[in-house]
């Protein structure tokens, strides 16, 4: 998508603020339904990040898979839970909550310093000339299909086996 610079920057700031607010909502909201809806906002913002870089297929796939399936499944699972354990009592922090928040903030600050200290201009994207010609002649969906059936065949099959084992494990645990 060819947007002018200021509009592109405003769009990225809007999506980034949606990500931050949604992430804070997932962590800080005590009602699990509201937390699941905040997770849906985060997943929508992540999928919309792919549109300015002309990755429409990835954006649509993430919307369908994550927001359309995973988040709806989470909302249904939360709705079937017993709501009495989420009362409106005063919630006091425990030692585990303090240690967890300390670890998470230290990881956050280490990531921020690592990202700010990295020289991003030193990273060079190398492509061969025939790859550039191939990218011009085929669409994004065709490129994904070609790479999945040639270069990424083994990792794709391994991921499908892992997902199948996880699904069978979840079904067997649900029956018990």
Curated annotation (Swiss-Prot):
It is an enzyme of class 7 (translocase). It comes from Liriodendron tulipifera (Tuliptree). NDH shuttles electrons from NAD(P)H:plastoquinone, via FMN and iron-sulfur (Fe-S) centers, to quinones in the photosynthetic chain and possibly in a chloroplast respiratory chain. The immediate electron acceptor for the enzyme in this species is believed to be plastoquinone. Couples the redox reaction to proton translocation, and thus conserves the redox energy in a proton gradient. It is a multi-pass membrane protein. It is found in: Plastid, Chloroplast thylakoid membrane. It catalyses: a plastoquinone + NADH + (n+1) H(+)(in) = a plastoquinol + NAD(+) + n H(+)(out); a plastoquinone + NADPH + (n+1) H(+)(in) = a plastoquinol + NADP(+) + n H(+)(out). NDH is composed of at least 16 different subunits, 5 of which are encoded in the nucleus. Belongs to the complex I subunit 6 family. Keywords: Chloroplast, Membrane, NAD, NADP, Plastid, Plastoquinone, Quinone, Thylakoid, Translocase, Transmembrane, Transmembrane helix, Transport. This is NAD(P)H-quinone oxidoreductase subunit 6, chloroplastic. Signal peptide: none annotated. One of its GO terms (cellular component) is chloroplast thylakoid membrane. Its EC number is 7.1.1.-. GO terms for molecular function: NADH dehydrogenase (ubiquinone) activity; quinone binding. It comes from the Eukaryota. The keyword NADP applies. The gene is ndhG. PANTHER family: NAD(P)H-QUINONE OXIDOREDUCTASE SUBUNIT 6, CHLOROPLASTIC (PTHR48479:SF1). The chain crosses the membrane at residues 10-30, 32-52, 61-81, 92-112, 152-172.
